[in-house]
Amino acid sequence: MRILSMLSALALASVAAPGRAQPLKITTSIETFASLARSIGGSNVQVESLSRGYQDPHFVEAKPNLVVVLSQADLLVYAGLDLEIGWLPPLVQNSRNARIQSGASGNLNASTAIDVLDVPSAKVDRGQSDIHPRGNPHYWIPPVNALKVAKEIAERLKQIDPSHASAYDANLQAFGAELKAKVPGWTAKAAALKGLKVVTYHKSWTYVSRWLGLEEVGYVEDKPGIPPDPRHLAELIERMKAQGVKVLLIENYYNRSIAQLVTDKSGARLLVMPSDVGATALTKSYVELVDEVVGKLAAAS
């Protein structure tokens, strides 16, 4: 953190520089939001993600160079719901960029547009696990949610850069039309998935399960972010056998050894899934990400 503080002077110099050049600079916490921002901003924006699609968004290393990136941002887009709580807030603070501080027009918590799932009914202690007290933050894959985030990005861009408002509206309309054209194909491909019983490593596929009609039977992690104990795994394996679970979903950034043990003993198939743009060479955009997610699930059903 000392290094972050040392870079604050450079960050401040960047913020204070007059005559800010176009295009507008958008910084995002994950690659999916970067893809959405490029779709909406077009040639009027320059977009950079603070994390890569193959990284766990809960645990991104707060490297000093990210302070400089944030110091130059006109708009920051992040998932919220405490997904980035372990690394993003100190970077934003040390950037000394008034444009992206909490409450500023350049600070966009994308979760405010989402119908949030898994909101705990009782008070939770984050010290015991990676439970999110405000609800599940892994919401960006279903098209309805991606479009909501895209609309929020468009609105913020119009506030920050009203001279290009018509371009942002046109780009949003084009993105919405692209999704409208793709959804019937995704829905048809996923028709056989309705009622499919699955287990997931982390409780991060809830929104996808709700969208595609999957039934989540259990989770390898008994408590989010905490390695499971043998008793939980034994109970999970027996439940999978009893209910005929054939698929276990895991993101490509998790260690697969425990999940592989569960599938070996239960007879299920381990399906390594991309959960963010850039997770694989086949997921270079939001649409490609959904293509890959739906395609892999359909092939495994």
Where does each model-flagged region fall?
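Bacterial N-terminal signal peptides that target proteins for export
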Residues: M1-L7
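Extracytoplasmic metal-acquisition and chelation regions
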Residues: A21-S301
